[in-house]
């Protein structure tokens, strides 16, 4: 859901931060990603940890192109948050998931998170090779 052209952007940067970071470390990373985004870099992340979610929100609010990899897939009749919906409508956001929606509790959450972080890195590496 969103603008598939974001996958073709030449410069991408994966956002991954530990859930154990202090707030000041997250704030520092946020400044780094905002600066990269303002230089034309598309940010990509599964937005799993609190820090990743905070940085993603700040980037999207700053009109920085962003790709979100959803850990749980798309539920039926999925409607993104107003922030995501507006960014999608403006061509600044792409929501992707390699997983089908499942209503049950996800039992392999750690493996999914690791996979999505690796996928984000690979997408960035491929784009940066071409650029």
Residue positions per predicted region:
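Glycine-biased, small-residue-rich flexible motifs in mid-sequence functional cores and linkers
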Residues: 1-131
């Amino acid at each position: 859901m969103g603008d598939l052209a974001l996958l073709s952007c030449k410069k991408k940067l994966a956002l991954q931060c530990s859930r154990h970071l202090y707030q000041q470390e997250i704030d520092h990373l946020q400044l780094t990603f905002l600066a990269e985004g303002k230089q034309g870099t598309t940010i990509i992340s599964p937005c799993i940890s609190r820090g990743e979610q905070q940085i993603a929100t700040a980037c999207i609010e700053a009109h920085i192109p962003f790709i979100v990899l959803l850990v749980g897939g798309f539920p039926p009749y999925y409607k993104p948050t107003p922030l995501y919906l507006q960014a999608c409508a403006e061509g600044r956001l792409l929501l992707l998931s390699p997983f089908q929606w499942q209503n049950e509790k996800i039992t392999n959450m750690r493996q999914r998170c690791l996979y999505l972080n690796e996928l984000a890195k690979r997408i960035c590496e491929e784009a940066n090779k071409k650029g």
